[in-house]
Swiss-Prot record:
Family membership: Belongs to the tRNA(Ile)-lysidine synthase family.
Organism: Streptococcus pneumoniae (strain 70585)
One Pfam family linked to the record: ATP_bind_3
Ligand binding (ATP): 27-32
Gene3D superfamilies referenced in this protein's UniProt entry, alphabetically: HUPs
Protein name: tRNA(Ile)-lysidine synthase
UniProt gene name: tilS
Physiological role: Ligates lysine onto the cytidine present at position 34 of the AUA codon-specific tRNA(Ile) that contains the anticodon CAU, in an ATP-dependent manner. Cytidine is converted to lysidine, thus changing the amino acid specificity of the tRNA from methionine to isoleucine.
Enzyme class: ligase
Amino acid sequence: MREPDFLNHFLKKGYFKKHAKAVLALSGGLDSMFLFKVLSTYQKELEIELILAHVNHKQRIESDWEEKELRKLAAEAELPIYISNFSGEFSEARARNFRYDFFQEVMKKTGATALVTAHHADDQVETIFMRLIRGTRLRYLSGIKEKQVVGEIEIIRPFLHFQKKDFPSIFHFEDTSNQENHYFRNRIRNSYLPELEKENPRFRDAILGIGNEILDYDLAIAELSNNINVEDLQQLFSYSESTQRVLLQTYLNRFPDLNLTKAQFAEVQQILKSKSQYRHPIKNGYELIKEYQQFQICKISPQADEEEDELVLHYQNQVAYQGYLFSFGLPLEGESIQQIPVSRETSIHIRHRKTGDVLIQNGHRKKLRRLFIDLKIPMEKRNSALIIEQFGEIVSILGIATNNLSKKTKNDIMNTVLYIEKIDR
């Protein structure tokens, strides 16, 4: 194939339509060097500013010489290049994580929004086959994605539809360690696939076909389940066990960096079925929150170091506190103003719940803990609920319940009103 053929493919796919700056992960191998040649030649046509990034893994004698040559190449092309050296105990996983962390740093520094890698169809076959041998979940057998949004960046793999044999032989560095079978991927490439191709010469095409078919099913299920609120457990549990599992897996696709194992997935299923309330970290900075018939998975948000102190409000005063405006005896106007009868004889205390808190209702004392359970108040709402206290007794739990003391206060000569308005925090 000729270079213009690759350009036409890139333009047809619109890989760089949304991007002004792109970082190319440049290893020095044939695939990344040819991608460099295409992108640097057609920067104007693709309307991108190209930035190069290279990781020297320090695993071969030639590594430092290759780094120098790449610096020369960047200088000749008048392109910026960023280089980082891997250190520590080497493994495929550590090296991969190091590379992507470094690439993200470069993107943040340069304002680039696209990371371009030279993965091709042969890499795709190896990846799918590796995952199959490892016993990964079905959805991961769709392989590497052509385009993948991770946070605020997009990873683009424009060579994924091409095989390595489609690339012309140009100047590049040959990694001799690729011929050794020390690493799993090398054994796949050098031994397993060639043997299986003796049985089926089109084995690579078959693997790619399976990956594409799984991707089709995955996308179809996502589209068909678009109107199903999986986080509503009543809705989720109305389906068969098999459908529940598929819907839950589709829901988990929203969190590409979560990657639950089969055992962890089964544990999440069990929690959703058995626990009424649950909040706990699960993996990779995510937590599972369940509150009766609702659940969600979200990033763990940082907690404040210290709780806010109790607030004291005096008669004829106003104060904004935790998203509300409290006005003691001074009327507020509006349709959504809450009014609680109180006494003007003493100040009002506004706080969060404490151990042993009691509310009087219909002449009976009820512990807040029991009240919250009876009313099925979610744990998060229990912890954030504002309690209004006067004369050492709870007058109201804002938006949840009111003490019968307020009825007595209505007819008291010293009565007044606490006005409450929801405001932006």
